[in-house]
Structures are given as structure tokens and as C-alpha cells.
């Protein structure tokens, strides 16, 4: 079985500070992982690299067939649809309805067709 997530010697800088150094791991289909650690240990930065929100400075990182160090902006929504992420502190937008909060997330992940969006939101609600 081949890895669906494969990180080799990954390094990440945030505001010129090295926050991840020499990260190496593989995750195969059906496996899962918990990221735990002290505040400031790089957990969120690592997750944000997987979500293509934080760039990889050095090394190689692949999720499915996406090279995270060279992913095209137009491919990011498709990548994000394939990844299940549970954020520690997720906040709804308090000035919006539940429908509008879900609409915001779907649009942010690349959904464009209004009929498909409405169907998906109605499934969830």
C-alpha cells in the first residue's frame, strides 16, 4: 500500500522563524494520527501545510497526487475537499445564519454551482 501523505525532510518558516525542521512521516489509507504537543510546537503549522495554507520552504510533501511545495492555487479547493480536518477552536460567524456559515465554507473550498450548494447544505441541516 502506498502513502497518501508523505513528508520528507520538510521545513517551514513562519515570520522568518524555523517552526518545523526535518519532518518525516507517511500515512497510508485507513490510518489516522493525532497531533499533540505543547503550545508553539508546530502542530498548527504542520496542519496548515497539509491544507496548503502555509508554504513548505524545504523538503518534499505530497498528499494524494498533490505536491504541496508546488500546488497551483486552482487545485487547493480540490485538495481540501479530500482532507478531513477537525480544528481545535472553530468559531461560527456570529453575524450569519447556520446556512450562511455553511455556504461560506463550501464556497471557500471551491463549490460554485448554487443548486449543488443548496442540496449539500440541506443534506447537512
Task: For every predicted segment, state its role.
Residues 51:
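Helix-to-loop junction immediately C-terminal to a conserved catalytic motif
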Residues 59-67:
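Conserved ABC transporter NBD signature motif
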Residues 36-38:
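The feature captures the beta-strand-to-loop junction immediately N-terminal to the Walker
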Residues 103-116:
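ABC-type ATPase nucleotide-binding domains, specifically the catalytic core motifs of the NBD
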Residues 68-84:
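ABC ATPase NBD coupling module
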Residues 95-104:
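Short coil-to-helix segment of the ABC ATPase nucleotide-binding domain corresponding to the Q-loop/switch region
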Residues 66-67, 115-125:
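Conserved ABC ATPase "signature" region
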Amino acid at each position: 500500500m502506498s502513502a497518501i501523505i508523505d513528508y520528507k525532510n520538510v521545513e517551514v518558516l513562519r515570520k522568518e522563524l524555523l517552526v518545523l525542521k526535518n519532518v518525516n512521516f507517511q500515512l497510508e489509507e485507513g490510518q489516522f494520527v493525532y497531533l499533540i504537543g505543547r503550545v508553539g510546537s508546530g502542530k498548527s503549522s504542520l496542519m496548515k501545510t497539509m491544507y496548503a495554507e502555509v508554504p513548505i520552504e524545504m523538503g518534499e510533501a505530497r498528499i494524494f497526487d498533490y505536491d504541496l511545495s508546488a500546488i497551483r492555487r486552482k487545485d487547493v479547493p480540490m485538495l481540501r475537499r479530500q482532507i478531513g480536518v477537525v480544528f481545535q477552536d472553530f468559531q461560527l460567524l456570529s453575524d450569519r445564519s447556520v446556512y450562511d456559515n455553511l455556504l461560506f465554507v463550501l464556497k471557500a473550498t471551491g463549490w460554485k454551482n448554487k443548486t449543488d450548494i443548496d442540496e449539500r447544505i440541506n443534506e447537512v441541516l
